[in-house]
Amino acid sequence: MFNFKCVFYFIPSTGHCVPPARSGHRCVADSNNLYVFGGYNPDFEEAGGSENEDYPLFRELWRFHFATATWQLVRTEGYMPTELASMSAVLHGNNLLVFGGTGIPFGENNGNDVHVCNVHYKRWNLLNCRGKKPNKIYGQAMVIINGYLYVFGGTTGYLYSTDLHRLDLTTREWTHLKPNNAPSDLPEERYRHELAHDGQRIYILGGGTSWTSYPLDKIHAYNLETNYWEDIVTKPHEKIGYPAARRCHSCVQVKDEVFICGGYNGEVILSDLWKINLQTFQWTKLPAVMPEPAYFHCATVTPAGCMYVHGGVVNMSGNRRTGSLYKVWLVVPSLLEMTWEKLLKTFPYLAQLSTLQLLNLGLTHTLIQRLK
């Protein structure tokens, strides 16, 4: 019997090869794998010592295979970007799109290119774009809606932005969108916020500057049809209220529900998990608590609705980072997912069998693909 609980599970790795502790990285997932790109760790030993040519950054792409719980450093071809902290990343089909980010020192070596890595063919390409590109920034957020990539906010390291740009992924042309609002009605400049969308509006969740974090009781929403920014008043969780203001948190979306987790409010590192429904704008605090509070971590969600959280800064005074990986189901898993988890737990050596053996056991081709 599967007893569903909204709780974080620590995922021990079965191999010797694991990514070092890091922050400022990004991750994406498909049904089979979690991909972790970039990151930063000023601790020389933790960051790989003299073997890491890019210290204190990580110029690398890691893959975590769900079925076997193993990490692998992905050997890629082509030019991998060097802006490795606080870039934005999104998975579009088999393509990992990476935009912006900063090198070291922060703010001195920023990017405004779109790099694409096909995770199937393991090859990086630079997307040759025209039009009005965003400034060289980091800490921005982005979403893909109907073949357009939208980028909002970010910082040069000195100035914070409230700019909204759109890239047509078919024509590869950038457009600097100019909303119809008066300048005083635009969202506050920010970085390390997150974005969600419902197809008609883009919602900004949190973020801030080096001296402030923005609250979540009201949310700025950009209306794609009217070209106006709107203010959305949200509803608090009964007797609990609203989530704390935060920046450097993570955010994933499952249909109409958006989940935020962790972050920093200017005083403490957060460990809570909240969801907001984009139809009712009702906030709900979920029972799951991160095993260690973290910010500058990364999170993503699988198509089946399981969120993975990796890394982050977990101690401010010691500036300590973690390399821990956790997962939490955000929805009740399907019967297939429950059975699959049980099968992998009971027969951990399933992946070592041949395709013919697996077919003889009754596994479908789709499930066999998840093992390879």
Located regions from the model:
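Beta-propeller domains
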Residues: 1-13, 37-72, 107, 120
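Trp- and S/T/G-rich repeat-edge/linker motifs of beta-rich repeat architectures
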Residues: 2-14, 69-75, 122-129, 171-182, ...
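Cullin-RING E3 adaptor/co-adaptor recruitment helices
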Residues: 2-9, 41, 300-372
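Short loop/turn motifs that recur once per blade in beta-propeller domains
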Residues: 11-24, 53-54, 75-84, 106, ...
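Glycine-centered tight turns/hairpins at beta-strand boundaries that repeat
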Residues: 16, 30-54, 76, 92-110, ...
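Beta-propeller and closely related beta-sheet repeat lectin domains
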Residues: 23-27, 83-89, 113, 136-142, ...
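Beta-propeller blade signature
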Residues: 50-69, 111-123, 162-173, 216-228, ...
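Solenoidal tandem-repeat scaffolds enriched in leucines and small polar residues
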Residues: 108, 114-224
